[in-house]
A protein has these predicted regions:
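Hydrophobic secretory-pathway targeting helix
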Residues: 1-37, 396-445
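Membrane-entry signal-anchor segments at the cytosolic-membrane interface
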Residues: 1-14, 121-127, 140-145, 400-418, ...
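Alpha-helical transmembrane segments and their helix-start/interface "positive-inside/aromatic belt" motifs
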Residues: 3-11, 194-207, 303-311, 407-416, ...
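Structural detector for short beta-strands of small beta-barrel domains
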Residues: 35-57, 446-475
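Extended, hydrophilic extramembrane loops/domains of integral membrane proteins
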Residues: 81-122, 500-539
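Transmembrane alpha-helical segments that form the functional core of multipass membrane systems
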Residues: 128-132, 138-240, 251-258, 545-552, ...
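Generic detector of multi-pass transmembrane helix bundles and their immediately adjacent loops
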Residues: 211-344, 628-769
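Hydrophobic alpha-helical transmembrane segments of membrane transport and translocation systems
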Residues: 322-410, 423-426, 727, 731-792
Length: 792
């Protein structure tokens, strides 16, 4: 079958599947039991609205599914004055409706309860659009990428999650499944070839590194694995209290989530390097093993910084509201969530640790993959009849490399290492003696009257352990305060250890650093003080330092610039983006401006001003713009409020509505898209430059073809990067949904309705929009890079 016929056939199949699922969804109805009460969940559409009432709406719904299909019913859409729960309906809106049945043979509708918006069809249309674009752009490779996603989903939902639910060792299971997914993805996308071998070996090496570091991290920071929320539900605590989850090892499940969250990024790096080395060998058989290894390192150094951004921005985008909390002064209680408290909170610390060790793992994937891919080129068979005759020889390629190396500074790497080590030591000393004011009260003359603050303290000794029961232990601790206005003073604090609720327990031992909440007058400490959190930021700083050192050692000069660019990106976010958003400026506009600054910093500064970097910057902004348009248009159909979580509700209840939460949600999605767009663009443009260097006689169209070869090779693995990043973060949620007894007790809703819940639909949209932007970035980058090289 020719390529265009294959594309046509694939598009027809996708459209047929979308149409079938669309019809099936519109007929959805399911019986749900609430105790002895039988109800039917079905679909209804708003046909008429009565807005005469100022306090609520009277909506007339037509039932679209179930045995009541075609009937109409009036529903009072009650507003209670809370923006995070009230919703304004419009004619044409479709919602899930719950109809109670007083009798099993009931023919008419007595009462109806409004449930979630019916968001699933629109998400289905976006999924179909993504699949069609992947087929049109990628052809057979696009079809294989779709098949890979489908098979990955089957393995995750029908093998990985059931094994975890049954209580098998999470770390062993996640490593085994990750190895299987890696092998399957590479074989399906690239077939049985040598580049598959190098990619798989490199990915597995990085995964083992992540597994080891995750175990060390969760033990060093006393992570319980229970700090997960789903909307307004404290999911981790709910699962801990549910008998069906008593066999689960939550700490190891946290490590399993970190492994799964990193596997996509490592597959992408491994495939990018393997594909680039293979492509270079195809266009120039004179490339030696040593030169092939060097080419792998060149591509890996170009992409490792942007891949790190992909992981980091994926997590930052989902936590944008949390990042704003330190800038909110709550009435009467002050700054309840200073940065010092948030960074030591388990949920935040676990997310930061996941981003750090994921970055270390993918950086270590670079040397492993490069060495294996280079060695395997020794056994590659190239058809020299298809290669131009006037290509550079091995000696000429070596001379080109020496000329490039002579231009590089020999002192940048050791200087960078010294600066990083000194900075980490200084930062450690600073955080160990840091404090954060919550409330500060002064009299009319400006004299300090009272203060409440978070401050670091060191546990000197345990004075007494008393009132021990089956569920609690009371420790009397002597703690020396290391910071704040009471610095140097010793406190006697009671630390309650709850044996049956580890998330609410701070296991402080003599010598540990803890975060304390203290208060009182300047002359005397008050009586009510407590141990707030375990001091987790110290270990995070050490791991951050290890990450920077590894980046420099592997990336050399490019690694030093990568570190500087990462720090620069962090400064842009902390000192530019967050203050402007907190000041009430439009979040989407601020994020777009910040994205441009970060893309420029990450590409032009790290790699240097060149054709490939400017091509990547232009392509990145095009991808972010397209994805942003998709997100903004989708908001109109999906009716997100941006307040589908407990943090937003707390902010609204305390200070009203200081932000446009809808725009905040969309802005968070754009942040998550940025890393993917940058990474996809630089991987394609970097590989095309290596191909052009190996064979300068290639025409622009041949260069575009090579760029598309690399781009479509990484398409499936880049999609997996986002997919597995979200799976890793939501591993407990997936287990709770798939385990039948848990789903019925925690989520008394059909799966189709769960997919339409605002927080779930937002995560799905984040994934789809990012993937759509990535798919379009590949041809844009290939075309711009090819014709830019031609003009040179």
């Amino acid at each position: 079958m020719t390529e265009w016929r294959l594309k046509l056939f694939g598009c027809v199949v996708v459209l047929a599947i979308v149409f079938f699922l669309h019809v099936t969804l519109l007929r959805f109805s399911q019986t749900v039991y609430h105790g002895a009460l039988e109800t039917i969940v079905c679909i209804g559409q708003v046909k008429k609205l009565d807005t005469n009432e100022s306090v609520d709406q009277i909506a007339t719904f037509q039932i679209l599914s179930s045995r009541f299909r075609g009937q109409t019913v009036e529903v009072d859409n009650i507003w209670i004055g809370r923006d995070y729960s009230d919703r304004k309906l419009y004619i044409g809106d479709r919602l899930f409706l719950e109809i109670p049945l007083r009798r099993s043979d009931q023919k008419s509708i007595d009462t109806v309860r409004l449930l979630e918006y019916f968001r699933t069809p629109y998400l289905l249309y976006l999924t179909g659009l993504l699949a069609v674009l992947m087929i049109i752009i990628g052809g057979s490779k696009g079809i294989r990428a779709i098949a890979t996603m489908f098979l990955s989903g089957l393995i995750v939902f029908y093998l990985l999650i059931p094994l975890l639910v049954k209580g098998y060792n999470p770390i062993f299971v996640s490593l085994s499944i990750s190895a299987l997914l890696t092998l399957m993805t590479f074989v399906v996308i690239a077939g049985f070839s040598r580049k598959v071998i190098s990619g798989v070996i490199g990915t597995l090496g990085g995964l083992i590194m992540v597994a080891v570091l995750s175990i060390i991290g969760q033990r060093a920071m006393y992570l319980t694995g229970l700090a997960e929320e789903f909307g307004f539900l404290e999911l981790g605590i709910a699962l801990w209290r549910t008998p069906g989850a008593h066999s689960w090892n939550f700490t190891d499940l946290l490590s399993a989530g970190m492994i799964l969250g990193s596997v996509g990024a490592m597959m992408d790096v491994g495939m990018s390097i393997s594909s680039s080395v293979h492509e270079v060998k195809e266009v120039n058989p004179n490339v030696s093993v040593r030169q092939a290894i060097r080419i792998g390192f060149n591509v890996g150094r170009d992409v490792m910084g942007t891949m790190a951004d992909t992981l980091i921005f994926a997590y930052l985008g989902a936590e944008i509201i949390t990042m704003l909390l330190p800038r909110i002064d709550f009435p009467e209680v002050g700054v309840s969530y200073p940065f010092l408290r948030i960074v030591n909170d388990e949920a935040t610390a676990a997310a930061i640790l996941q981003a750090i060790i994921g970055t270390i793992g993918l950086v270590m994937t670079v040397p492993i993959t490069s060495v294996v891919a280079g060695i395997l080129t020794k056994y590659a068979k190239v058809d020299r009849d298809r290669v131009a005759q006037d290509i550079p020889s091995t000696e000429e390629l070596e001379m080109m490399h020496r000329q490039e190396e002579e231009k590089k500074s020999q002192y940048l790497v050791p200087f960078g290492l010294v600066v990083v080590i000194c900075s980490i030591l200084g930062l450690q000393n600073y955080v160990n003696h840091s404090a954060a004011t919550v409330v500060r009260k002064e009299d009319s003359s400006g004299k300090l009257v009272s203060v409440s603050e978070y401050a670091k303290g060191k546990v000197i000794r345990r004075l007494e352990r008393n009132a021990e029961t089956e569920s609690t232990v009371h420790d009397i601790l002597e703690i020396e305060l290391l910071a704040g206005i009471y610095k140097g003073q010793n406190l006697i604090l009671r630390n309650v250890i709850q044996k049956k609720m580890p998330l609410l327990t701070i296991p402080a031992e003599p010598g540990d650093i803890v975060l304390c909440r203290v208060g009182g007058s300047p002359d005397q400490i008050g009586l009510v003080n407590l141990v707030q959190e375990y001091g987790r930021d110290r270990f995070l700083i050490w791991m951050f330092g290890v990450m920077l050192v590894v980046i420099i050692l592997v990336g050399r000069n490019e690694g030093v610039r990568t570190v500087i660019a990462m720090v620069g990106s962090g400064l842009i976010i902390y000192f530019f983006m967050l203050p402007l958003i907190a000041g009430g400026n439009p979040p989407v506009l601020i994020v777009v401006l910040s994205s441009g600054m970060i893309a420029f910093c990450s590409l032009v500064f790290v790699i240097g001003p060149s054709r490939k970097t400017f091509s990547a910057v232009i392509s990145t902004m095009a991808g972010v713009t397209i994805a942003g348009l998709i997100v903004v248009i989708s908001q109109h159909y999906l009716h997100f409020s941006g307040m589908e979580n407990a943090i937003s509700a707390d902010i609204v209840e305390a200070v009203g509505i200081p932000f446009d939460f809808r725009q905040l949600l969309l802005a968070g999605m754009l942040i998550g898209l940025l890393g993917v767009a940058v990474d996809g663009a630089i991987e394609v443009s970097s590989a095309m430059e290596e191909v052009r260097r190996a064979n300068p006689q290639m025409s622009s169209w041949q260069l575009i073809s090579s760029g598309m070869n690399v781009g479509t090779d990484i398409l499936g693995t880049m999609v997996n990067t986002l997919l597995f990043a979200y799976i890793g973060v939501r591993i407990l949620l997936l287990m709770a949904i798939i385990a039948p007894d848990l789903r019925n007790s925690l989520f008394a809703s059909p799966v189709v309705e769960l997919l339409s819940i605002g927080i779930t639909a937002a995560e799905i949209l984040r994934l789809l929009a990012g993937t759509l932007g990535l798919v379009l970035v590949i041809p844009i980058t290939a075309i711009i890079s090819a014709f830019w090289h031609r003009r040179s």
